Amino acid sequence: MKKSMFTALLAVLAVSAFGADYATVEVDHVRDTVTKQSYAAEYVRFGAEVAGLQLGLQDRTGDYRDGTGLFHSTEATVGKTVFGITPYVGLGFDDGKNGVAGNAYQYGLVGINGGLKAGPGYAFGGVKTRANEAHSTNPKQTVAYGTYSIPVVKKVSFDLNLSKSYQDIHENSYGLGFTANF
């Protein structure tokens, strides 16, 4: 319950603090390519441009289908778009499996993304990696991701998502979402 309250608080702060330019809600089917275990991942994302910087906030909850547990993480990023490409840095907070004391950890993020008009929609893709300390035991992860957004009505789009994780976490995912632009 504390995590849900924290997520709701972050969402309200994100929208009110810098007037979000967009909000996305997404549900993905995720499959671990090593253990073959699968789960549903739910995302809530907010983003805005403030003083020429791209600010982002992502909240993710994964629920294992076999009932063994939940994973939850929150990431905040800041980037600068140059010639249509946005390199960014950020911080992540992972509660670990089931939020058990001692399993939580923080990590840095570095990434790059960009997009372009493609047919009736917009294609967007990128890659991000966790930047842990050299001797950290926290899991390392690099994610390549892509989204194709199809306009439904003015300022609302339907999103098709794909991603692949590498390093310590090996996952493939696909999903659907909605984005509202403000």
Model-derived regions: residue spans:
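Outer-membrane beta-barrel proteins
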Residues: 2-182
